[in-house]
A protein has these predicted regions:
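NAD(P)+-binding Rossmann beta1-loop-alpha1 motif at the extreme N-terminus of oxidoreductases
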Residues: 3-6, 13-14, 18-19, 24-94, ...
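Conserved binding/recognition cores within well-folded domains
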Residues: 2-3, 220
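Active-site-proximal catalytic alpha-helix in oxidoreductases
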Residues: 164-175, 185-186, 192-194, 202-226, ...
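Rossmann-fold dinucleotide-binding core
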Residues: 32, 48, 110, 118-122, ...
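Helix N-cap / loop-to-helix initiation motif
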Residues: 180, 229-233
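Rossmann-like NAD(P)-binding element
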Residues: 79-132
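Short phosphate-binding/catalytic loops that engage adenosine nucleotides
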Residues: 59, 196, 229
């Protein structure tokens, strides 16, 4: 089922025998672009940050959160919405059957390895096979997601950095090797509508800016571990000496140490290069749930947090 000017429209049975490219063309161009609908999946804070961006730009969305999502049990033994998702409670469904508007785009903002993303993506695309999949590729590639799905779904990757989206004006996109240019163009349109300028890059783990930034943060963490300087001095040196907008350790806290660790683990697994080996401080801090600003503590201590 697709939408035509906001109304459900059933395709004739024979349409499902058309090539994927033609079906995608029909799905996209029978839609009024102003009514493009997005289904956000997963209960992480990254989902909440993208929801804020979509809401602020008046783009309709629904959040699908399964009852067995780990984030539902992060604050007790009974399932409950994490605090950061409470403002969007009216947009959250816990059953695919409750998604009233078939989405044009399924958006997964979580910086997880592909094998951790795929079960939820599978569950959703079985119900909405015409949707384009827009997937965070901080810890995987779009082609890897397409490989796991084992179908001709169009998968586009993007470099969504939590804690960075509010001020960011550019976002990186990557196309799975088998995905269509049509799908990429559609995603560019939607990202432009949310205030982003898009840069299309090769489909690699971490893309460009997130990958380089994570590597720099890792080096800063090693400098702390080796007592080369205090964390304050390291951050001050990068802000005043290199003119970075934030110190690297402060920046890591803002993005989330768990996110940085996820990127570094994925880069090290992909390339086996020493420069991507995560500093043990990242792993130890994440084990202690010191994930940065979101948790109230990371390299620095903060007044509030919800992790």
């Amino acid at each position: 089922m697709i939408l035509h000017f906001g109304r459900p429209l059933k395709l004739p049975y024979f349409v499902h025998t058309f090539p994927q490219e033609l079906r995608l063309f029909m799905a996209i161009y029978t839609l009024d672009d102003k009514r493009t609908s997005i289904l956000l999946i997963g209960g992480s804070r990254h989902t909440a940050e993208m929801a804020i961006r979509l809401r602020d730009h008046e783009i309709p969305f629904t959040i699908f959160l399964s009852f067995d999502d780990a984030h539902m049990f992060a604050f007790g033994d009974s399932p409950a919405l994490p605090p950061y998702l409470i403002p969007f409670s009216s947009s959250i469904v816990t059953s695919i059957a409750d998604v009233t508007i078939p989405p044009d785009i399924i958006m997964d903002c979580q910086p997880l390895a592909a094998e951790l993303k795929v079960p939820l993506i599978h569950e959703v695309i079985e119900e909405f096979p015409l949707a384009i999949i827009l997937c965070s590729t901080l810890a995987c590639t779009a082609t890897e997601i397409m490989h796991y799905i084992q179908d001709s779904h169009n998968v586009i990757g993007f470099g969504f950095l939590p804690g960075h989206t509010g001020s960011a004006s550019t976002i990186e996109l990557s196309k799975a090797l088998n995905a269509s240019e049509l799908a990429l163009n559609k995603i560019e349109q939607v990202m432009n509508a949310t205030g982003y300028t898009c840069e299309v890059v090769e489909d690699r783990v971490g893309l460009v800016m997130p990958r380089i930034l994570a590597t720099l943060m890792n080096e800063a963490a090693f400098a702390v571990l080796e007592n080369i300087a205090t964390k304050e001095d390291i951050d001050a040196a990068m802000k005043t000496g290199v003119n970075y907008p934030h110190g690297l350790l402060e920046w890591a806290d803002t993005i989330g140490l768990d996110t940085v660790l996820s990127m570094l683990d994925a880069l090290y697994a992909e390339y086996r290069q020493e420069r991507y080996r995560p500093c043990i401080l990242f792993r130890q801090y994440v084990r202690a749930r010191w994930i940065g600003k979101a948790g109230g503590k990371g390299f620095y201590t903060y007044a509030s947090g919800y992790a």
